[in-house]
Amino acid sequence: MSSSKHSSVFNYSALFLSLFLQQMDQNSLHHLDSPKIENEYEPDSLYDMLDKLPPLDSLLDMEDLKPNAGLHFQFHYNSFEDFFENIEVDNTIPSDIHLLTQEPYFSSDSSSSSPLAIQNDGLISNVKVEKVTVKKKRNLKKKRQDKLEMSEIKQFFDRPIMKAAKELNVGLTVLKKRCRELGIYRWPHRKLKSLNSLIKNLKNVGMEEEVKNLEEHRFLIEQEPDAELSDGTKKLRQACFKANYKRRKSLGDDYY
């Protein structure tokens, strides 16, 4: 029952809408067209209007253009352009104003210097001092090399050459060079060490005569470092070496 009622209402509404549209005048609806804006001035007319404008200098009141304290004007001009051409500007800089340049400025009445300048001077002076120090050291080494004599060098024959150079306060190369100049081509440390060991061993066995001969031979090597060991000294050294070897071996056998 309710569905038939709704359908009848829809039919009446559709009929009413169709009758309303038939009675409307189609010509009564206005077209919504946007109006076209037309420019009333042509481009050429704009240029003509600019030509008709009065000169610019006639629009300005020259009485209002008054100079300030830093400018000096000459008011003898015939047109607006002459006004600006005849302006004289005072570019004088006061003496109490100091311009900044690439180099630091130091005032004459200032009692203190720039920290940067002091630092730079300190670095330069340090470099100079280092150069002078190195040069002095080289000169001292050269003088030290020239002053080395045989009497001073032979006191260090009983120790290695590197240790001797350190105690003599010279370089190893300097000491070797000076030794060659004095005729010392081989450092006699090993020879003297061998002789001292041999003398000690012979003293322990009571061979006083051989000890005396070895001491004389040691003195000879201290005077002539390139002198060779005698055949008798070499034989004694070999005999002592064999005796020490047998003694150590026997001690080792007793231990095991």
UniProtKB/Swiss-Prot annotation:
Coiled coil region boundaries: 190-224
Cleavable signal peptide: none
Pfam families: RWP-RK
Keyword list, A-Z: Coiled coil, DNA-binding, Nucleus, Transcription, Transcription regulation
GO molecular function terms listed in the Swiss-Prot or TrEMBL record: DNA binding; DNA-binding transcription factor activity
GO cellular component: nucleus
RWP-RK domain span: 130-216
InterPro entries: RKD-like, RWP-RK_dom
Task of the protein: Putative transcription factor.
Protein name as it appears in the record: Protein RKD4
Organism listed in the record: Arabidopsis thaliana
